[in-house]
Amino acid sequence: MVQTPSEINTHLKHLLACDAYKLSHRLMYPNDTTNLYSCLTARGGRGGFPNFVWNHEFAKKIILEVFGNFCDSVLAVQNDPGLAQALTDKVTTVFGDPQFGLEFTQHICYLANFLKQHHQLPLTVKIHQSSEGLAFRTPLVTITGSDQMVPELVWLVNYFETVLLENIWLYQTTLTVAQSLKLLLERYANETADNTEFTHFQCHDFSMRGMSSLQSALYVANAHLQYFSGSDTILGGVAAKSILASEHSVMCADGQEGELNTFKRLLEQFPNKNLSLVIDSYDMWHVLDNILPQLKDLVLQRQEKLYLRPDSGNFETLICQGKRFNPEDKTTWGVIDYLDYHFGSTVNQKGYKVLNQKLGIVYGDGITYERIEYILEQLKQRGFCSSNIVFGVGSTTYQNLNRDTLGFVYKLTAIKKGNTWHDVTKSPITDPTKQSIGGRFDNPNLIQVYG
């Protein structure tokens, strides 16, 4: 049976936003367990980053939202027999055990009585303050039982692992990736430009259509916008900026024979706005060498900048061919060479060429950190300033991230049996990189947000 997320009961989504095995763990801890202490951290992963970026406020909002929704749904189970039965049926179906399903629902009702008396979960949560350069294996979120904890509810400490990781790792990983892109752009700006202010707009978020869900797209856009000002994910942040831009459906509307008219019409229609036009719907080199020169006066009369966007081809040669360039051989020219030839450029204080201020390049086809670095290095070798190009960073970068990029994990680090705490450390002999940190953490950078 096919089921979309919107068809699932909202309360069940809040109650069961976890891996199935979490429901059984309340039965598995030692009988004398009176408390647990768990920690979310990034242990280092496959991204090759020396450190990572962490945002306290985002993690706090996620945790408080998850806890709030969970508590509301727990109370709803007690007040709605139909919902209680639906919960029992769902758990029974998953585990094939009616008694297990019934007992889980009864346990949720026990928690509801606790919430009515204490008005919050018996948990204390601390979150590390924000940082742009944290060391891996730093405790980021700690959760333990509060003074109100009772043995029957100890399982709650680890119950939220799945939903917290699911909602935290992508945003924080995107922050780290966006920071690395910003630092790369600033490096080339410092080498070739008169200032670095333009780098705030030099990576534009193109990722929404390639993300796995609207929620993922919003997390990525919001994180991207902590370092850049541009995103085409309109809902992704309160300060997202974009410009008017065409796509192939617009550029092909008049057919190839009417391509000159298409460019002319759009330039005349938007003379006072920043405008981005796709140039490779047919023959990009014809556009650069014939159509745009015919419209030169229209381009130069504009009040704002015209951005030209190639959307296909070999990234190694498309924008600039580096030292292969031969002014007498147009097969060695890239996009920037045609624009320089037909519209001119100036030389900045560092001796690098800056295209006519009415023109720029946008390139967003399969963009990665490595491709950006390659293109900027080629431009530098040819004597062009890095400000001549804006990159569209899409799902090739942001959808290729996963939890292992930075190694986000949530692990039990201490257990209290009776009145005594014991450190807990996972240390698999088959993979030393998965060794967990152990103990409880008295870190002044951990700020209490719940309990």
Swiss-Prot record:
Pathway(s) the chain acts in: Cofactor biosynthesis; NAD(+) biosynthesis; nicotinamide D-ribonucleotide from 5-phospho-alpha-D-ribose 1-diphosphate and nicotinamide: step 1/1
Coiled coil location: none
EC annotation from Swiss-Prot or TrEMBL: 2.4.2.12
Residues the entry annotates as binding beta-nicotinamide D-ribonucleotide: 232, 309-311, 364-365, 403
Top enzyme category: transferase
A Pfam family recorded for this sequence: NAPRTase
Superkingdom, taxonomy of origin: Bacteria
Any one GO molecular-function label of the UniProt entry: nicotinamide phosphoribosyltransferase activity
Record carries keyword Phosphoprotein: no
Keywords of this entry: Glycosyltransferase, Pyridine nucleotide biosynthesis, Transferase
Residues reported in the UniProt entry to bind diphosphate: 209, 248, 309
GO terms under biological process: NAD biosynthetic process
Gene3D superfamilies per record: Aldolase class I
Catalytic activity: beta-nicotinamide D-ribonucleotide + diphosphate = 5-phospho-alpha-D-ribose 1-diphosphate + nicotinamide + H(+)
Cited function: Catalyzes the condensation of nicotinamide with 5-phosphoribosyl-1-pyrophosphate to yield nicotinamide mononucleotide, an intermediate in the biosynthesis of NAD.
Record-stated family: Belongs to the NAPRTase family.
Full protein name: Nicotinamide phosphoribosyltransferase
Organism expressing this protein natively: Mycoplasma pneumoniae (strain ATCC 29342 / M129 / Subtype 1) (Mycoplasmoides pneumoniae)
